[in-house]
Amino acid sequence: MTSSKHICMFAAENDVIPGAKVGGIGDVVRDVPRALADDQTRVTVVIPAYGAFHELPDAVSVGTFTTSFRGTPQRVEMYEVSIGRDNNVRYLVLHHPLFAAGGKGQVYCDDDANQPFATDANKFALFSVAALSAITSGNIDSVDVLHLHDWHSALTLALIRFDTAFESLKSLRTVFSIHNLALQGIRPFAQHTSSFQAWFPHLHYDSGVLADPRWPHCINPLACAIRLADKVHTVSPTYASEIVQPNDPLRGFHGGEGLEEDLQQAATQGRLVGIINGIDYPAESAVRLSWQKFTLQLSEELLSLIVRQNTLRTVDYTAHQRVLAEAQRKRPAHIITSVGRLTDQKMALLFQSTRDHRTALECILESISGRGLFLLLGSGDAELEEQCQQVASRYPQLVYINQYSANLANLLFANGDLFLMPSSFEPCGISQMLAMKDGQPCLAHSVGGLRDTINDESDGFLFKADSLNAQAEALVQRVNDVLHLREQKPDTFTRIASAARKKRFEWSTSASRYHTELYS
């Protein structure tokens, strides 16, 4: 690079800041700036303070400015959070009472089904205009590239296009990253307190540029960003090729989620780019523990989580007791692990019925009875949590841990034999990379980033089929085949595990492509 460049990122999450991560976007916003920053590049990352992060011990006030929202001036405070020693990376949080609408420190709100995204849309509409005002007021200086993440910051592109207050920002290069295409932030144009005209009553705009392709009376922030950004970025090449196709529920295929025509146009114009995410690699790999040490650490970590809660939940007690019981036995022949948020995306195939009316999860559990253990770590959707708990009550070979902690996840990554990731769709995925890093091969659905990171029977295992039922059947069959391989050809399985451990998804490689394919 021949000249200095300043990249400014707007996002809803940033895992550098304690408590500011909910999903995978927080990991990416944590890691990408560090990989990008060098002597020629500085990066500024901006998120809302959510009523909490401006109060962190390392947060220092660095400015106050006003922005226009709902037709009135709004005072916004800006704080810099100094965490770690990230040269040429600056972390900012914006404070305004509306950003704490869901409660102090709550990143997202859970609105009623009859008004989806209403509270979050208010919050992120203000965040979008406030973050832009931080630039035009001089509180963030000399920006060259504006990099936006998901629908939460997508409205900034509409404001740059139609609000004369941001006329000076039209020369900025803009990049929009899609981490979750299913969440689009759709709201009415008008006649609601959470609507585009309620937020920006002074604006004269072209509704055709901003409208949802299915509901023309609604604004779709994600569609708007896809149409207006200089580059549209997805977090894997295969996912970029999938989302230009329409969804096909009968085939169990997740594509463009209604925005495929906009994405097709972006692809035709050369604006759609797929770049795989990366992970960090420590100097030394995690050490695989003996069965006694593993179960001891697992039970201790579980107990520490339990004692922090006000009440003892049945699901936690059951998991802890099951781990204690397993500690008294020999190590099972096979330890299957899975780590992730409990969402339809991650769990639908496990609960899909097979031809004998059992779910795929039940079939897998019955196939490992007496010879294996399935350790499932995750929380999320309440109905899915209940389903997992019910299955665990019937199958002692399932240890369902309805929690999340990095320590528990790392224990499972480092000590399992086969990592299961049967996502219905997967923009990139990070859990499979973390398991592979520790030498645990992954068995995954051949979609999106899973297909891009796993080579079947070389460093992991893939399955695919053309309907939901067939996908569930293929998942069960593949698990059985892999466990049979592990029993009958242990040298082959060990070779695959070794290849998984050696595979690398370096952020430096991805960052180089960011510079050449997104920012130039």
Q: Where are these predicted regions, by residue range?
A:
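Catalytic cores of nucleotide-sugar-dependent glycosyltransferases that transfer UDP/GDP/TDP-activated
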Residues: 1-520
